[in-house]
Amino acid sequence: MTDAIRKFLKLESAGGIILIIAAAVAMVIANSPLQSLYSGTLSSYIAGLSVEHWINDGLMAIFFMLIGLEVKRELIEGALNTKEKAIFPAIAAVGGMVAPALVYVAFNFADPIALQGWAIPAATDIAFALGVMALLGNRVPVSLKVFLLALAIIDDLGVIVIIALFYSSDLSTLALAVAFAATATLFVMNAKNVTKTSLYLIVGAILWFSVLKSGVHATLAGVVLGFAIPLTGKDGRSDKHSPLKHLEHVLHPYVAFLILPLFAFANAGISLDGVSLESVTGMLPLGIAAGLFLGKPLGIFTASYIAVKMGLATLPDGINLKHIFAVSVLCGIGFTMSIFISSLAFVGAPADFNTYSRLGILMGSTVAAVVGYILLSRTLPKTEA
């Protein structure tokens, strides 16, 4: 396993634990006398945007930039740099996005507003999933960790495409023109072998602002910027002189230990006041929970099984189908990514849709985490791998 992947797994695993704490604290505060302070702070405005908006559109753009950097590196020299390496997690990821969406639609086909959230259970929270896997220590084979990482990266790409195609509206032609010009500038700089990161960040800031005003979700600017950062330095090497790897190294701790926990804190604080058993067992939360806990493993495992049996892909060394099934359950931990999609899906909808969708996410993610851990623990050797 490369140093880059090892560092990634270590940071993401620890970050997953911080995420759990941040979400738990938010839930406690949202159901305490501090609830008004919590909601008031998030809804207060700074420079024309609410604090919650700055977190969801601003800080999360940095998170998506990191995704762009990681995906580019993995495609060029990492876990996805050959067809043989990429095909198995890619097939699994597609199955793991289609099946949860279909399960959700089966629960909510009669409600046109609820149908807008079809993509909510299609996402996987890589930090949370790796955090749960880390509890098993070195019993987990390296190849299984890399499979989860590759699957989650492809899953993230799918989420990015979904956001771009289905959760953008009221497009501004002028702002889009500026965004396209900024994007072109970034890739011309890359082609001309410009390696000064600060120049990319300046153009990236212009891109983010124009995308924010365009009607396309602003976080997509982060992905574009991440893909534009060059992997190799002036000397053509991608090790010590890589702008991409340097920026990835700088951003990773801030994303894992600040940005994602802040996002979880700002979005997981659900007030249970007025929430009844009847509402919790409604089609919206049940559809999300079932999509995450049932749809994810159904899609990932079925797609993986068919791919192996048909000879389209081979299982990585040291992994069997029992391991794949256990990991597929862990992938039902949608948490931050699912909450992010729900915040886009129900813009303008009654507040109950946001509340119940987040309850469904928390229910499905929690069950997936517990059951996934138990299954993985039982399928792995009792001693360290």
UniProtKB/Swiss-Prot annotation:
Gene3D superfamilies: Na+/H+ antiporter like domain (1.20.1530.10)
Main location group: membrane
GO MF: sodium:proton antiporter activity
Superkingdom: Bacteria
Segments crossing the lipid bilayer: 14-34, 49-69, 87-107, 117-137, 146-166, 171-191, 201-221, 250-270, 283-303, 324-344, 356-376
Subcellular location: Cell inner membrane
Catalytic activity entry: Na(+)(in) + 2 H(+)(out) = Na(+)(out) + 2 H(+)(in)
CC annotations in GO: plasma membrane
InterPro entries from the UniProt entry: Na/H_antiporter_dom_sf (IPR023171), NhaA (IPR004670)
Topology with respect to the bilayer: Multi-pass membrane protein
GO biological process: regulation of pH
Keywords: Antiport, Cell inner membrane, Cell membrane, Ion transport, Membrane, Sodium, Sodium transport, Transmembrane, Transmembrane helix, Transport
Role: Na(+)/H(+) antiporter that extrudes sodium in exchange for external protons.
Family, as annotated: Belongs to the NhaA Na(+)/H(+) (TC 2.A.33) antiporter family.
Record protein name field: Na(+)/H(+) antiporter NhaA
Gene: nhaA
